[in-house]
Design a protein with these regions (language model features):
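A Rossmann-like FAD-binding core segment of flavoenzymes
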Residues: 113-116, 120-134, 139, 200-301, ...
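Mid-to-C-terminal Rossmann-like scaffold of FAD/NAD(P)H-dependent oxidoreductases
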Residues: 1-17, 25, 218-220, 231, ...
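FAD-site-proximal beta/loop scaffold in flavoenzymes
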Residues: 158-177, 264-339
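Hydrophobic Val/Ile/Leu positions in short beta-strands of Rossmann-like dinucleotide-binding domains
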Residues: 9, 182-183
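N-terminal Rossmann-like FAD-binding beta1-loop-alpha1 element of flavoenzymes
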Residues: 6-32, 190-199
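Glycine-rich flavin
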Residues: 2-5, 22-177, 205, 210-214, ...
Length: 412
């Protein structure tokens, strides 16, 4: 007879492992299914091949950039800054592995059963787990939580081959930086990688189809960041769409389209940073009648799907596709299942951060969104050029901006 769990979580990324641990803390018998061969296992993309190793490389980049740009004025005069991308990558991998082991420890401490394999819902309350080797097993669950995350997107003609066209995973393991790189997509992932490789001496061109870098942020942020990147020697191509790539030429020839027509860019590597797609294929959602919201699982404010006893959290449950949002959804879902939930999800006040240099952090409405929503907008702004700590750290580019409703004074 199959073992019966109160909760089976499919996926052990920031949403899944947090949900599993919280459910176990609330006294629920919990299992978490994760295929160890996918994205390194516990911790998912974020800990293994996303947020954490990227931030480690960004710290290396920040140190290199500070020495180059501000060393003399700060009284530190290295004869020459030498780059060792391999050492930076090794450090990032060590940090990821340490944190992944920490999740394993938390699973043991809280008595979460880690089931290694690929999970699929075969019927309400039943999850089939197929390991890389061996026979499948079936877990019976009173509640199932889908936390399978997302995978990198690409375009036809720009399929990731791991060498000439790479995604974020390959970029995080790149031990020898190329001479030239085109980063396609100037969202937070794109600008972070542009920052890293520029700091390590790569000639970086950042290509974005929309009219601004970090196009979902306040327009002023995009202008300030683009200006800073240009000062550091990066080429910024906004309002530019990629059309084709000649991989056989050396260097490769990337053809792009602007409002002035087609142009070409020479490059050694193309890094695709055009977003991620929720991973729902092979989960068996159609068979059990789970309703979808476009490519995502449709959920309510308690992270419940259209099928009783099935929940969805994290990237698979919709935007914003952010680790901390997924973690909070995991807590909400676990507490709802345990019958102790007090606060449903709110999606209007989730912070978003880009750890490039200068760093970008936003929460709430942009000035443009507030105006479009019909508010009488009032803006307060403070330049970091007047901020003591920013000046002492030589990080005084940028500003703090508050968008408010002029009528009632509400911060938007």
């Amino acid at each position: 007879m199959a073992e019966v769990f109160d909760v089976v979580v499919i996926g052990a990324g920031p949403a899944g492992y947090v949900c599993a641990i919280r459910a176990a803390q609330l006294g629920l018998k919990t299992a978490c299914v994760e295929n160890g061969s996918y994205e390194g296992g516990l911790g998912g993309t974020c800990l293994n091949w996303g947020c954490i190793p990227a931030k480690a490389l960004l710290e290396s980049a920040a140190l290199a950039e500070t020495l180059k740009s501000h060393g003399d004025e700060m009284g530190v005069r290295p004869v020459e800054v030498e780059y060792d991308m391999g050492a930076a990558v090794d450090r990032s991998r060590f940090i990821s592995e340490k944190l992944t082991k920490g999740i394993g420890f938390l699973f043991k401490k809280n008595e979460v059963e880690h089931v290694v394999g690929t999970g699929r819902i075969t019927a309400p309350g039943k999850v089939e787990v197929t390991p890389d080797e061996g026979d499948p097993q079936t877990l019976e669950a009173k509640n199932i939580v889908i936390a399978t995350g997302a995978v990198m997107k690409s375009f036809p003609g720009f399929e990731i081959d791991g060498e000439k066209v790479i995604g974020s995973r390959e970029a995080l393991a790149l031990r020898s930086p190329p001479e030239r790189m085109v980063v396609v997509g100037a969202g937070y992932v794109g600008v972070e990688f542009a920052d890293v490789f520029n700091a390590f001496g790569v000639e970086v061109t950042l290509v974005e189809a929309l009219d601004s870098v970090v196009p979902l942020a306040d327009a002023e942020i995009g202008k300030t960041l683009a200006r800073s990147f240009k000062k550091r020697g990066m080429t910024i191509r906004t309002g530019t769409k990629v059309k084709s790539l000649d991989r056989d030429s050396s260097p490769m020839i990337l053809t792009v389209e602007t409002d002035k027509g087609e142009e070409t860019i020479e490059t050694d590597v193309v890094l695709m940073a055009v977003g991620r797609s929720p991973m729902t294929e092979g989960l068996g959602l159609d068979a059990v009648g789970v309703e979808m919201n476009g490519p995502w699982v449709k959920i309510d404010e308690w992270c419940a799907s259209s099928v009783p006893g099935i929940y969805a959290i994290g990237d698979v449950a919709g935007e914003p596709m952010l680790a901390h949002k997924g973690s909070h959804e995991g807590i909400v879902a676990a507490e709802k299942i345990a019958g102790v939930a007090e606060h449903p999800m709110r999606y209007d006040n989730i912070p978003s951060v880009g750890y490039c240099h200068p760093e970008v952090a936003t929460i709430g409405m942009t000035e443009e969104e507030a105006a479009e929503a019909g508010y009488e907008v009032k803006v307060g702004k403070y330049p970091l050029t007047a901020h003591g700590r920013a000046l002492t750290a030589a990080h005084n580019e940028g500003f703090v901006k508050i968008v408010a409703d002029a009528k009632y004074g509400e911060v938007l």
